[in-house]
Amino acid sequence: MNSVDIGRCRKRIVQYIWDPEPRNDEEPDASIWCLGVEYAPQPQKITANTTPGKLGNYQDELEAGTSKIDDVTAHGWPEAFVSDFESKIWMTYRSDFPPIPRLDNDEANHPMTLTVRIRTQLMDPQGFTSDTGWGCMIRSGQSLLANAMLTLCLGRDWRRGDKAEEEARLLSLFADHPDAPLSIHRFVKYGAESCGKHPGEWFGPSATARCIEALSAQCGNIAPRVYVTNDTSDVYEDSFLRVARSGSGSIQPTLILLGTRLGIDNVTPVYWDGLKAVLQLPQSVGIAGGRPSASHYFIGTQGPHFFYLDPHTTRPAVPYSIDGRLLSKTEISTYHTRRLRRIHIQDMDPSMLIGFLVRNEDDWEDWKGRVGSVVGKQIIHVFKGEEATYNQGRRGALDEVEALDDA
């Protein structure tokens, strides 16, 4: 065994000990949900015509979490669910991208963690060429927006490998370059100008939602319209329709973003069923946030556990082409993973950004009916108008979802 093989084996052993892949053994009879789609908990039988001589061909894929020959059956997960999970766009930290200028004043430096400040001074004198250590909420927000756009462009049943050119064009909008309309550069620029968030500072759900709203509007018809609640999980129909309706009066595809806080240090148990129901709605495009000081993108649930995509992996930035060059198959693969991760709801941070994609009038009516009939305590309320709600008041409002603090 050569040194490369030894290094790979060591990496796999360390990962197995400190960050083992979850097994379907805690709630083996509970249905698995992924953004509104339900999967039977028991895996389908799959076979792999793999001989010992061919095993080495899959080592790189196994480490990247992209191989079809993996531990899906051994860990008890149905292949249909894992394929759906793998097809979701996974935005992560990136390195070696064009610098994001930093502000050289005490006010700008104060919000940064000590580690990021030292790294910036030593390695990035012209600005940030990586978002490692501070960009996870932006990446989670990009993931939410990208998957909403993916659903609009290619459909909810799309799976990785199909219509690669269309996917590549979508991903190019999020390239780590100042000219890409939905890049981290654009998020940071708008955050500094309009949200009081300096380059290198961790974004909260509220600032992320406002960036998504503004940047999507600048994209025209490429991105959906965006309705952002005022740091609450209350949705006002009159306000939503002003955003969603076109000149003809029909509802256009609209992304609903609700920034909320479901507790103080952890998600209050009374909201557990309501939060799980969020990812079971067919309009769901996921949840960004939800992990103390480390944002993730949550897309699935089984029992009390939530499945998520973790942005805390640093990969080289994908080159941005102004002449329309499409991403290669290898470059596209860096936006996907079969590596399942999950967390118990009691360990989630209560501050989060919840997203829904409403496509048309029927979808809007369906969504309203579903959020009003969830099991357990509701976390989302829909009202006709903000003024009427203010004048009438609402019994028990102080006992419900807390306003979001994005400080």
Curated annotation (Swiss-Prot):
Single GO MF descriptor: cysteine-type endopeptidase activity
GO CC terms: nucleus; phagophore assembly site
Q: Name one Pfam family in it.
A: Peptidase_C54
EC id: 3.4.22.-
Biological process (GO) annotations? aggrephagy; asexual sporulation resulting in formation of a cellular spore; autophagosome assembly; mitophagy; piecemeal microautophagy of the nucleus; protein processing; protein secretion
Where does it localize?
Cytoplasm; Nucleus; Preautophagosomal structure
Q: Which UniProt keywords apply?
A: Autophagy, Cytoplasm, Hydrolase, Nucleus, Protease, Protein transport, Thiol protease, Transport
- What if the gene is knocked out? Impairs autophagy.
Reactions listed under catalytic activity: [protein]-C-terminal L-amino acid-glycyl-phosphatidylethanolamide + H2O = [protein]-C-terminal L-amino acid-glycine + a 1,2-diacyl-sn-glycero-3-phosphoethanolamine
UniProt entry tagged with the keyword Transport: yes
Which domain of life does the UniProt lineage start with? Eukaryota
Q: What class of enzyme is it?
A: hydrolase
* Active site, per annotation: C136 (nucleophile), D310, H312
| Entry coiled-coil feature ranges | none
The function of this protein is: Cysteine protease that is required for autophagy. Plays a key role in cytoplasm to vacuole transport (Cvt) and autophagy by mediating both proteolytic activation and delipidation of atg8. The protease activity is required for proteolytic activation of atg8 by the cleavage of the C-terminal amino acid of atg8 to reveal a C-terminal glycine. Azg8 ubiquitin-like activity requires the exposure of the glycine at the C-terminus for its conjugation to phosphatidylethanolamine (PE) and its insertion to membranes, which is necessary for autophagy.
Family label = Belongs to the peptidase C54 family.
Q: What is this protein called?
A: Probable cysteine protease atg4
Q: Which organism is it from?
A: Aspergillus oryzae (strain ATCC 42149 / RIB 40) (Yellow koji mold)
